[in-house]
Amino acid sequence: MIQISNQDFEAAFRYFEEAVASHKRSLGPFQDFRTGLAEEWESYKVWLHHEARGRLKAGDWKPGWAGSGKILDHVLAAIRIKEDKERRNNIVEWEPKRGDKSTSIVRLLEARKQPSLRQEAENLLFRLFREAGDPEPVFNELTEAFGRRYDLISYLFFLRDWHQFMPVRSSIFPNAFEKLGVPHQMSMRCGWENYQGFLERLHEVRRHLERVVPDRIRLIDAHSFCW
């Protein structure tokens, strides 16, 4: 069982409070995650989740769509979001800055073009978003189909259920967990067990935040605290 000591959490929380209070755009001391600078910094993730779910429209999907390309079209629309500088998907590396092959969605794009890949990909995505089975096998099959792209796979699970799953940026969270005294290496380690270790640490951060922040704490608030 993952446990963050009160001492390590309080040191990290003081650092967070100081970062909020001393920032040039600060409106004052940290109060909660729904007001002030903390809300300004991280509210885009709440917006992104709602916007992406609206584009995904998984509730409208039909089993017969698998292989048609419709499911992949909805999934790609839920990833490639860029309304403006602030309202965009900066969680998944989807923009082809060095060509499509450099992105995390390259295999989604390939599946969209190739019927032999499209059927399998859309069956998997249908299972992820429309069936309430054990998520572990689906996670493992998604990594086989789309590559061990932590940003992509975790983002899809985030869209499935943000009360249970959160997106990963493997270059950021290990530093936060190290400071909290619960090291967790994530780079090049996209897998179900590693992802569960990430989520366990977020739940432990959430438990500590509930002690010191008066407002209701969501899992996404723990994610923002670590980000």
Where is each model-derived feature located?
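Contiguous, well-ordered alpha-helical segments that form the cores/surfaces of helical PPI scaffolds
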Residues: I153-D161
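An N-terminal alpha-helical hairpin/helix-loop-helix interaction module that forms a charged
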Residues: M1-F146, D161-W227
